[in-house]
């Protein structure tokens, strides 16, 4: 690595040390998609990005191991995650199935009422023709004209009833879908509460941390890009941390960590990485629970696109559940090496 890149790396490390929490750093290092998004936002050359990742692995390892009490807490998180995740996974899979079944039911009723409305409209048209025909023939064929007139009016009434019935059926179905979504929301409250109480005061703002992860990643990348440009163009000014952009969302309550820039950067051990992943898994679980049970759009009003909303939520929930399953596999005994 050339001397200029070494200076850049030191500046980057200072920024991560001062402005990025341990949880954010661990998630960035354990999520390849997040890392690639960060590298793209920061506009880092590949060799520089690789060196930075090695240095950040060492920094993260130091942050994880520095506080033994915190390390013990991570071990507790790991054990809790291993114990509770299978049950939570079954519950979440059940919610995914219910969301998809509900979406399918909403779609079927919507298709059925649409077809029925088409039929009722056709009947209504026929009613109009027969009624007009009956009125037109009245002066010439009294008996037949009254039959046609009565038939036309009867069909018209039937069509009106059919149209109203279809509208009522679809409305009732949507209201029921809304109620079921509300029940999902309420049934998940206790699970979310238990998980949040377990994590406790050690992880403030955890939902915000996960919900805003994409924005956080992009923000970190933009700040690193600004640092790089400032270093490459001294006239832009020296590096100054921009705390108002990212802030420090940290379970350690703002604990400052020792600067690690000396010596060759070494990769963090798999054992240390997955211990941190346990805490990250719990944070993501909170986000998954929130995603599964929060039904704002449905509760604000079930519209024709409510089935798509349900499908989208189920798909997003399934993707995050798959990621959590991978973390659970990483945390299995014998995977520390």
Swiss-Prot record:
Coiled coil segments of this chain: none
Expression (tissue specificity): Widely expressed; the highest levels are found in lung, thymus, pancreas, placenta, adult brain and prostate; also detected in spleen, liver, kidney, colon, small intestine, uterus, spinal cord, adrenal gland, salivary gland, trachea, mammary gland, skeletal muscle, testis and fetal brain and liver.
Keywords: Acetylation, Cytoplasm, Lipid transport, Phosphoprotein, Transport
A Pfam entry, by short name: ApoL
Modified residues (N-acetylmethionine): 1
Modified residues (Phosphoserine): 250
Single GO biological process annotation from the record: lipid transport
GO molecular function: high-density lipoprotein particle binding; lipid binding; signaling receptor binding
Compartmental location: Cytoplasm
Record bears the keyword Transport: yes
Listed GO CC annotations: endoplasmic reticulum membrane; extracellular region; membrane
Cited function: May affect the movement of lipids in the cytoplasm or allow the binding of lipids to organelles.
Similarity comment: Belongs to the apolipoprotein L family.
Name of this chain's protein: Apolipoprotein L2
Organism: Homo sapiens
